[in-house]
Amino acid sequence: FLPSFADELSADPLQFTAADDRGIRSCLRRRRKQAEQFFSTVAERDDSQRDEIEGPADHHPLVGELLSACSVNRELSTVVALGTGTGRLLPLLGRNARQVIGIDGAREMLDVARRRSEEAGATEVEFRLGSLEHLPLGDGEADAMVANMVLHHVANPLEVLREVHRGLAPGGLFLLADYQAHERESHREKLGDLWLGFDRNELSGWLELAGFEIETERELAGNRRRPGVFVIAGNRKQV
């Protein structure tokens, strides 16, 4: 057995790596599909379901505070809301930009967000259907992007961060709000989470690999209903 195994390996040293790679990619595709199906079915009740489980989104003021602070010395013409969902954050983003683009992979979510924007009389919002792994944006189209409680829903966060880097103008602002690492398994079933939050050091490493430098960050302690949250503001490194 050993000689034949060694001969086989030396004859094609990449075959096992290729097989592993195919398995990983297949797993990621399944995860993406699961997330898409989940959000397509919960669009109309997503906000109420989240509020029931976690309480109000009390980190939103912190997101707005950092966005305003980081935009003092830069002009934000176009701000993109990644995984915009039902559009709860869009009014806040609209106060800091001339145009807001909401992107989501679930058409049903965009329908809810569009209806709410029309009811609020928001004319500066545009909606685009597309995945976060392949953003419907031109290279450098956005001055800022906001990923609010989005990254824990994607199968491959680093892939998404690299795509964010592509869509941002050099020096553009990236604002990321997400859970700190936690052990609340119920989030997988009830909220469609693929990741139970993130380790701070691991996330910093991904941001650096994707081409970002962290400008500032804040934390919001967890409570009985909701895990801890961190909000990170980073810049797309100048090339």
Q: Which stretches of residues belong to each language-model region?
A:
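N-terminal auxiliary segments of SAM/dcSAM-dependent transferases
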Residues: 1-37
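Conserved alpha-helix/loop element of class I SAM-dependent methyltransferases that forms part
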Residues: 54-76
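Class I SAM-dependent methyltransferase SAM/SAH-binding core
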Residues: 78-81, 85-134
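A short SAM/SAH-binding and catalytic strip from SAM-dependent methyltransferases
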Residues: 143-156
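A short glycine-rich, Lys/Arg-flanked "PGG" loop and its adjoining helix->strand segment in the class I
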Residues: 158-173
